[in-house]
Amino acid sequence: MKYIFSILRCYSLTELMSLIIFKLSKRKRYVYYKKENTKWAYISYLPEVFFRQHDDNYLNTHQNKRESLVMGQVFANNGFNFVVESFDTVSVDNRRYDIILGLEPNFCNVAKKNLDALKIYYATGAYYKHQNLMVKVRTDYFNTKHSCHVPYYRTVIENDAADLADFIFQIGSKYTLDTYPNRIRPKISLIDQSSNLYKKISIEQKLKTYRRNEFLWLGGGGSLLKGLDLVLDYFCQHRELILHVLGNINQEVND
């Protein structure tokens, strides 16, 4: 009952019906249209968030929810109609677009149909060849050390997003930039990771309440790639320290 009331507080009847239709639809997309706008943009990212813009519990599950909203707002504020489609579904969109923004594989699918469009790749990870190599290196290390046979998790499907793009917005640092081939680097603009830090934090209060021997690991899938096993090894050797692990933990590390 509490969950139902929380939904009713976040959604009008119209918004709730739109969300239900979206959930039931096979084609996961959101369309923003104003008759006076003549240009169209395609966003390959997260469409569901546009049906849940006032649901803070949903928005706070990952910073990429608000990132998707901001993309749409930028296009709307600059006189564009736009379509947002799930980045990992198979797009059958045949509309002609002026700008294409987002993640593979749909970024690549739609970019190849719109060669004259401005194509902006929104890169959330390192260059795919580097990432796949690091998955292999870290997993092989773990398997050798623990005499096990963990498969490779979090590998990235080979793609030509970076080559197709006119520009690349890359979340990360100079290290991330250096994972790309030299020929691609001039296209890249580094941007900071966004955050869901929406409440004011009192440093004074934190200093009064935190414990110097307790630490927090907060992460999603791909535990080996992120090095959780190395962190656990350290804490096993330092029993005076306490580690709280939150998030999706791959079974191989959990064991």
Stretches with model-predicted labels:
Residues M1-L115:
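N-terminal pre-catalytic "stem/leader" segment of glycosyltransferase-like enzymes
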Residues V110-D116, A161-L164, N182-I184, K208-Y210, ...:
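Short, conserved loop/helix-junction motifs that constitute active-site signature segments
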Residues P151-I188, L197-Y198:
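A short, active-site helix/loop in glycosyltransferases that binds the activated sugar's phosphate group
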Residues L241-D255:
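Nucleotide-activated donor-binding/catalytic signature segment of Leloir-type glycosyltransferases, i.e.
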